[in-house]
Amino acid sequence: MLRLSERNMKVLFAAALIVGSVVFLLLPGPSVANDKKKGPKVTVKVYFDLQIGDESVGRVVFGLFGKTVPKTVDNFVALATGEKGFGYKNSKFHRVIKDFMIQGGDFTRGDGTGGKSIYGERFPDENFKLKHYGPGWVSMANAGKDTNGSQFFITTVKTSWLDGKHVVFGKVLEGMDVVRKVESTKTDSRDKPLKDVIIVDSGKIEVEKPFAIAKE
C-alpha cells in the first residue's frame, strides 16, 4: 500500500506540474501585453497653425508613421513644408462634420475636387496596416481605390467603417483641442465651414528617435 501511495503521489505531482505549465503558457507575459498596447512608430512630425475667420485658434502637431507608410508620409511632409513649390500653407479645411471628421488638403480648388500629390495627380493606396482607432487619427481622403492626392482628414471619433478603404498615416499628438474647435465651427448644408478654416502656416519637426504610440 505504501509503494502504491508513493506512486500515486508521484503521478499527481507530475500532473500538477504539467497543468501548471499549461496555465503558465496560456497567460500572456509582460511583453505580449505590452505589444498589444504598442502602436506604430512616429518617425517625423508636422505642424499646422490654424485660423478660423480672423481668429488664430492654435497649433496641431501630427506624428507620422514613416516606417509603416513611407510614401504617404513623404507626400504629407513635402506638402507641409512646400518644398516642391506647392502645398498646404494657406489652404482650407473645406469639409467639417461633427462627430465624424474634418477634411482639408485641397490647395488647388479649395472645395474638395482638387489637390495633387508630389508623385503626380494621384498615387496608389500604400497599405491598410493601420486603422481608424479613434479620435485624432489622420488618413488620406480619396475618390475610390488608388486615388490618393493631397486631401486628408482627421477623425474626431472612431471610424472603423473606413478601415481598409483609406490609408491611415498619422495621429494628432498635440492640439486635439484645436481640432475640436474646428469640428465645432458652424457649417452650411454641404458641410462647408461658414468661416474659412485656414492653415496659415505648416512645416516639419524632426524626431531624433522614433517612438511608438498607443493605438487607443
Swiss-Prot record:
Tissue specificity as recorded in UniProt: Expressed in the kidney thick ascending limb (at protein level).
GO molecular function, one term: RNA polymerase binding
Keywords, sorted A to Z: Acetylation, Endoplasmic reticulum, Isomerase, Rotamase, Signal
GO cellular component: endoplasmic reticulum chaperone complex; endoplasmic reticulum lumen; melanosome; nucleoplasm; perinuclear region of cytoplasm; protein-containing complex; smooth endoplasmic reticulum
Stated regulation of activity: Inhibited by cyclosporin A (CsA).
Location in or out of the cell: Endoplasmic reticulum lumen; Melanosome
InterPro entries: Cyclophilin-like_dom_sf, Cyclophilin-type_PPIase_CS, Cyclophilin-type_PPIase_dom
Signal peptide (from-to): 1-33
Recorded family membership: Belongs to the cyclophilin-type PPIase family. PPIase B subfamily.
PANTHER family hit by this protein: PEPTIDYL-PROLYL CIS-TRANS ISOMERASE (PTHR11071), PEPTIDYL-PROLYL CIS-TRANS ISOMERASE B (PTHR11071:SF477)
The protein's name in its UniProt record: Peptidyl-prolyl cis-trans isomerase B
